[in-house]
Amino acid sequence: MKKRGLWLLIGIGIVLMGGLLGRSLWQPDPTNLVTHGLEQLQTATSFRYSLTQHQWVDGKDRVLTQIQGEKSGGNTRILGQMTGSEVEMIKIGDSTYSKDPFNKKWIRFANAPAAQEVFLAELNPLSSLQMKELGEVMLSGQGNVNGEKVWICNLKPSVQNQMMEVFWTDFQYTLYIRKSDKMLVKVTIEAKNKAKSDPMTMTLEFKDIGKKINIQAPDI
């Protein structure tokens, strides 16, 4: 009886170890993982984000853009620096406002569509994630973003963003997808300038996805 009990325990132990080993070795399909992560973020009603863009200029690495933003429905607010200047903007539906960095007064753009096109990546970070084709998607490993475990995927897509296509080429994307809910939480985009072949890197991070965010028009 004792031997039978011992063998039973050993058998249970082997099954449990096999299950844990199989779970640790299991890897998701990278294309499905990326597709699901992009779709979840594109359909999110709200989120907060950061955007940092580096570019080599005259042989030196320059930070062109460094902003914090939040988006709720059709409304967006950003705060940070672009090309060395302070920027604070609010987009409410079809209206866009900018705070003068010197007198701190808000002004409303007369031509809101033109302003939104110029600041497309900053006011709508998801525009940088629009793709015609994903291309080959590779699962390069696992990592950690802000204390959360993620899958890391690499791809060289065909982008669907006119502004990006005009100035950049050879796009390489690295996507960080949270394991717990398959949500896309970080993206690194690398590309080369079409005119000079200088490298560019853009990093996007997303948080508070789906949470309530209140964005209102400023007093002008």
Kindly label every feature range from the protein language model.
Residues K2-N75, K212-I220:
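N-terminal leader/targeting segments and the immediate start of mature chains
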Residues Q81, E133-L134, E165-T169:
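Short loop/turn motifs at secondary-structure junctions and domain boundaries
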Residues P28, S128-L139:
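A short, amphipathic edge element
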